[in-house]
């Protein structure tokens, strides 16, 4: 994976129709502009991958995080559709239309930014935003990718550990690839250090932090 950033991303072509005619495959494409200009003061984000640690730390309080004086410590929030059903995120992302449907029905997607695949954008016009560059990674890893893509200098993760259920055994390697690619970004994995994959902790731009230290460090 190559480190790419929103500031250099004008948009991309997506396939809107594909069919066979006369023995040849014909496709129609449409250009999708980058509609997001993400201005962040602190350069800090928190990514909530699951609610595994909710008994230790209630992640929902992050929806009202102010970030101290002039918002200098404010965290932009990223997470999946499951987390978006629990709290308002700055940026939600999911690839499963079944997870996204509740966000349409309760008007969440009408008032907040929700990313998904080109297919889902076409199925529900006007409801979602296209995942930039559409990397081949699992849903739970996408919030980390988006936070890095948006150019944050510090990314804190909640709910990411060895036991996180994702439905794929490759997800730990996918996180490792993102951390390696965005080598100038510091990734802080919040939780029990002994429950974090060794591959992550071996990288020079990672660190761990328990929940108490996270609360103090980020003025939550």
For every predicted segment, state its role.
Residues 1-220:
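Metal-ion/cofactor- or nucleotide/acyl-coenzyme-handling active-site neighborhoods
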């Amino acid at each position: 994976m190559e480190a790419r950033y929103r500031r250099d991303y004008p948009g991309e072509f997506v396939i809107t129709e594909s069919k066979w005619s006369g023995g040849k495959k014909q496709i129609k494409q449409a250009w999708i502009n980058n509609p997001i200009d993400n201005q962040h003061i602190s350069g800090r984000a928190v990514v909530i991958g699951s609610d595994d640690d909710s008994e230790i730390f209630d992640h929902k309080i992050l929806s009202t995080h102010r970030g101290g004086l002039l918002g200098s410590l404010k965290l932009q929030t990223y997470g999946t559709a499951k987390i978006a059903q629990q709290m308002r995120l700055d940026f939600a992302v999911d690839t499963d239309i079944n997870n996204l449907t509740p966000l349409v029905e309760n008007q969440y997607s009408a008032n907040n930014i929700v990313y998904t695949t080109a297919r889902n954008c076409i199925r529900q016009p006007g409801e979602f935003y296209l995942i930039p560059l559409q990397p081949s990674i699992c849903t739970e890893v996408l919030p980390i990718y988006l936070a890095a893509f948006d150019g944050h200098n510090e990314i804190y993760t909640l709910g990411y550990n060895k036991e996180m259920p994702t439905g794929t055994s490759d997800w730990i390697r996918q996180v490792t690839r993102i951390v390696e690619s965005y080598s100038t970004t510091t990734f802080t994995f919040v939780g029990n250090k002994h429950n974090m994959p060794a591959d992550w902790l071996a990288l020079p731009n990672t660190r761990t932090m328990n929940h108490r230290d996270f609360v103090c460090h980020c003025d939550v």
